[in-house]
């Protein structure tokens, strides 16, 4: 989403957002909480990715709108099968106004755009889809069809077929935007406030990544979280 925001000029490299620990829409009573309830303070794009600042992405999603988010993420194969050479693959869900109308017979709401911006709400993706998208960022837009089978050979050994993944290039408007996202993902591991800094322990290779905010059931603003009063499957297991 950050990459799409940069490519479509919804934000600039110097853009920053103040995070008080929640995001609120005008004329909308609900607060959209950050995973860090005390807030991150003012963060730029690199810091927002490294620290996984939900408020930054709520705000960016609001600027972009669901139509632009849907179109941008479609390039990365979300909501579609990856072409993995195993049976039973599902495409997941990349929600849109049209998807919700068809599947829920309901209009799209502004709040749903915000949570889609952090990969929550109706959106679903498989681990292989996330790996595919991450690889596309690392390869500067080169999207490779994932393969499990390396090669096949006939019983008599006469024929040999090597599995070749197909590749597709995601349109690039500014390569510097892609470099910035890669640097931000490195800061997730190596930055002092990176959410995956614990992985930075005698690494023998350069690592980049991005953590996610788990989606849990909601509590009313006046309610307190008491694990004993909640079904075990809904409890915080972090």
Annotate each PLM feature.
Residues 3-238:
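Beta-lactam-recognizing serine transpeptidase/beta-lactamase-like catalytic domain environment
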């Amino acid at each position: 989403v950050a990459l799409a925001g940069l490519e479509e000029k919804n934000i600039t490299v110097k853009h920053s957002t103040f995070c008080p620990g929640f995001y609120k829409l005008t004329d909308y009573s609900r607060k959209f909480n950050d995973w860090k309830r005390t807030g991150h303070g003012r963060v730029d794009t690199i810091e927002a990715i490294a620290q996984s600042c939900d408020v930054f992405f709520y705000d960016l999603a609001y600027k972009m709108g669901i139509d632009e988010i849907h179109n941008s993420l479609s390039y990365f194969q979300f909501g579609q099968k990856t072409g993995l050479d195993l049976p039973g693959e599902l495409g997941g869900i990349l929600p849109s106004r049209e998807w919700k109308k068809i599947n829920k017979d309901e209009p799209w709401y502004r709040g749903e755009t915000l949570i889609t911006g952090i990969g929550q709400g109706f959106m679903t993706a498989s681990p292989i889809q996330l790996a595919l998208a991450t690889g596309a960022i690392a390869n500067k837009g080169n999207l490779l069809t994932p393969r499990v089978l390396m090669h096949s050979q006939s019983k008599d050994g006469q024929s040999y077929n090597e599995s070749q993944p197909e590749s597709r290039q995601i349109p690039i408007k500014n390569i510097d935007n892609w470099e910035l996202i890669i640097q931000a993902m490195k800061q997730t591991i190596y930055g002092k406030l990176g959410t995956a800094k614990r992985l930075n322990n005698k690494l023998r290779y350069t690592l980049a990544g991005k953590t996610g905010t788990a989606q849990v059931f909601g509590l009313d603003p006046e309610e307190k979280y008491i694990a004993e009063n909640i079904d075990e499957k809904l409890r915080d297991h972090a």
